[in-house]
């Protein structure tokens, strides 16, 4: 129970909660433009032509809504740079691949270069933090987990999925504050 409480305390820390409003406030004040965003940006939500490997279309459109470019960038990086599956239980298999990070960032920026504003560009790192944070919150408070399953996830030997989000948030927290 103590690890679950620690996870909840970590995620609901006042500094983290306060940071969740930054992008939303900039959207509301029109400092950054409202865009059509997918909000579940990942490779498995793109259909490819089996002969040419060209992207044909996006799927999972139930998540499309007005939002910030930072959300799509953040979710794409969150899911795209890890060397493990999103639901990997073995923490030793969870690593960030710098080459994937560079390729995704370069590709994303090349596609939005004609529309992205300076303010939006500044929000991209926060978008990575925000989407990682949001998914960690979903994991901890998801109704798909029973109390006993949540306790299992929070056992040191079963830390897998939560640890991926927790470590990502701690890493991004560190970089946003100190780098």
Regions found by a protein language model. Give the residues of each.
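Short, surface-exposed loop/turn segments at secondary-structure junctions
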Residues: 1-4, 88-92, 118-122, 150-155
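ATP-dependent phospho-/nucleotidyl transfer catalytic cores
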Residues: 1-38, 43, 47-57, 151
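Conserved helix-loop functional segments at active or binding sites
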Residues: 19-26, 61, 79-82, 110, ...
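Secondary-structure capping and boundary motifs in well-ordered enzyme cores
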Residues: 33, 38, 65, 128-133
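Catalytic activation segment of kinase domains across protein kinase-like and atypical kinase folds
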Residues: 44-85
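Active-site activation/catalytic loop segments of kinase-like enzymes and analogous catalytic loops
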Residues: 70-113, 130-149
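Hydrophobic alpha-helical bundle architecture
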Residues: 108-126
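ATP/Mg2+ or Mg2+-diphosphate-binding catalytic cores
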Residues: 134-179
């Amino acid at each position: 129970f103590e690890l679950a409480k620690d996870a909840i305390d970590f995620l609901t820390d006042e500094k983290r909660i306060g940071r969740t409003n930054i992008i939303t406030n900039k959207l509301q004040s029109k400092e950054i433009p409202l865009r059509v965003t997918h909000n579940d940006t990942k490779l498995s939500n793109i259909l490819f032509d089996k002969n040419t490997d060209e992207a044909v279309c996006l799927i999972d459109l139930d998540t499309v809504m007005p939002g910030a470019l930072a959300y799509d960038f953040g979710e794409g990086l969150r899911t795209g740079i890890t060397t493990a599956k999103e639901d990997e239980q073995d923490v030793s298999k969870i690593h960030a691949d710098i080459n994937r990070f560079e390729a995704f960032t370069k590709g994303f920026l090349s596609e939005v270069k004609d529309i992205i504003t300076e303010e939006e560009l500044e929000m991209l790192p926060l978008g990575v933090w925000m989407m990682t944070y949001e998914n960690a919150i979903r994991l901890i408070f998801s109704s798909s987990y029973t109390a006993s399953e949540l306790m299992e996830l929070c056992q040191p030997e079963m830390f897998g999925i939560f640890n991926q989000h927790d470590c990502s948030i701690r890493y991004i927290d560190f970089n946003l504050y100190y780098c």
